[in-house]
Regions:
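Sec-dependent N-terminal signal peptides
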Residues: 4-13
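Secretory-pathway ectodomains
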Residues: 18-125
Length: 125
């Protein structure tokens, strides 16, 4: 009887982890220009872009591209929206997220504005 109780307890504890609530975030290809590498932060709660030194890898700055509004009555992880693509365009970084929204980050001013998606941004297969 004790074995069945232990087995039942293990199943109850492990059950939430058996079925993933969402697919893994997309693999985003970092882009480099003028010795600076731009990458998407792995946090889906808010879309951040990180700029780091291409040689040392040390972080230079990070900018919040968008905020994800989370409904407290729903599971949090299914509401996260990850960045899915980055592309350099002159002195700007074009960003696309899983919700098919696009943003333009001015790399000098570090200002963000909405951008009309006209092409696919680089997404690792």
């Amino acid at each position: 009887m004790k074995k069945y109780f232990v087995l039942l307890a293990l199943m109850v504890v492990a059950w939430p982890g058996i079925f993933a609530k969402r697919i893994p975030p997309p693999k985003v290809i970092s882009v480099t220009q003028a010795g600076i590498t731009y990458s998407a932060a792995g946090d889906g709660r808010s879309g951040y872009v990180i700029a780091s030194d291409a040689k040392t890898g040390s972080e230079l700055w990070r900018v919040k591209i968008y905020h994800v509004h989370v409904n407290p009555f729903m599971e949090e992880d299914v509401q996260w929206i990850y960045i899915s693509g980055l592309k350099l365009s002159g002195n700007a970084l074009l960003i696309r997220n899983e919700a098919a929204r696009c943003y333009r980050l001015d790399l000098e001013k570090k200002s963000v504005r909405n951008y009309r998606c006209t092409e696919e941004l680089s997404i690792k297969p």
